[in-house]
């Protein structure tokens, strides 16, 4: 099933590439440079992800740890506070806890131990100026890029009988999360009228949100029983939760960037912006979906 699912992703990319080339040929005046760049980047993302998700579990965990590191590093370039380098060592420790299936320690590590160590470390620096801003900014970055994001890696640890089961759960989450972004964008462009958060993200509309959520609920209803142990009702609820939480992650990251005064979080992914621009929805959908499916099925 994993191989068939990945083959479907490549088929969709081939279709998108052919459609883009056809439009460029038929409409030479159409400016398709950005779309072409986005598709090329998606090729790189899908190829890399396919190699990792098809490999052993430790490889996938290492991949997620690398994503957390790059995302946290990108976040640190945005905020105007000093980020202690020794805190980066918490990333491999966090994913080791996942690899050894230490769920209780995982729940304590970043939210509690990480917070206490971070706050105490800043006090020991000896300069109280900007203490609250520094600690809160760093801690929020940790929660987003390491703790919340690593819930996607926890999906690998849920099944005990089918080694591909966890990979299929990750694939299901990522496919719906990214499709949700695309669906809400297309619905918003085609029939969006009423803005949801005009001061944060003027392009987000109520019609785009509702259309995207309904689309993802239908997609979840179709592929949920194939890739997950969810029944029909649970698949619908999963689609609803992913659609809404993905929107929340998108607008929260937009609020952070607007507060800082930047349009994109970086330039790591050509045509997409930074890594945080690509995973902003996943930061919220990963923990929501993990706890939902853990409660329903495990």
Which residues make up each language-model segment?
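Juxtamembrane boundary at the C-terminal end of a transmembrane helix
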Residues: 291-298
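Interfacial loop-to-transmembrane junctions
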Residues: 259-281
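A short, conserved beta-to-alpha structural element at the edge of catalytic cores
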Residues: 281-282, 297
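Hydrophobic alpha-helical transmembrane segments of membrane transport and translocation systems
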Residues: 283, 288-291
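Membrane-embedded alpha-helical bundles of polytopic integral membrane proteins
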Residues: 1-241
């Amino acid at each position: 099933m994993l191989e068939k699912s990945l083959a479907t992703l490549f088929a969709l990319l081939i279709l998108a590439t052919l459609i883009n080339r056809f439009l460029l040929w038929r409409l030479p005046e159409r400016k398709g440079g950005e779309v072409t760049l986005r598709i090329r980047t998606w090729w790189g993302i899908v190829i890399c992800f396919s190699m990792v998700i098809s490999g052993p579990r430790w490889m996938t965990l290492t991949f997620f740890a690398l994503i957390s590191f790059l995302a946290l590093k990108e976040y640190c370039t945005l905020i105007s506070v000093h980020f202690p380098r020794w805190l980066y060592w918490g990333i491999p420790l966090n994913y080791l806890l996942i690899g050894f299936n230490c769920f209780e320690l995982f729940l304590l590590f970043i939210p509690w131990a990480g917070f206490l160590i971070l706050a105490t470390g800043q006090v020991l620096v000896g300069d109280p100026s900007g203490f609250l801003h520094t600690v809160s900014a760093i801690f929020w970055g940790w929660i987003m890029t390491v703790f919340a994001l690593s819930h996607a890696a926890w999906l690998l640890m849920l099944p005990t009988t089918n080694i591909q089961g966890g990979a299929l759960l990750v694939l299901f989450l990522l496919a719906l999360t990214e499709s949700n972004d695309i669906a809400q964008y297309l619905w918003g462009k085609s029939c969006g009228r009423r803005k949801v958060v005009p001061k944060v993200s003027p392009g987000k509309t109520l019609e785009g949100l509702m259309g995207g959520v309904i689309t993802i609920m239908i997609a979840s209803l179709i592929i949920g029983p194939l890739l997950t142990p969810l029944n029909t009702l649970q698949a619908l609820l999963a689609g609803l939760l992913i659609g809404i939480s993905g929107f929340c992650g998108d607008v929260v990251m937009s609020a952070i960037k607007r507060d800082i005064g930047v349009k994109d979080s970086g330039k790591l992914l050509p045509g997409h912006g930074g890594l945080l621009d690509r995973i902003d929805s996943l930061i919220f959908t990963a923990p929501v979906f993990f706890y939902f499916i853990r409660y329903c099925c495990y």
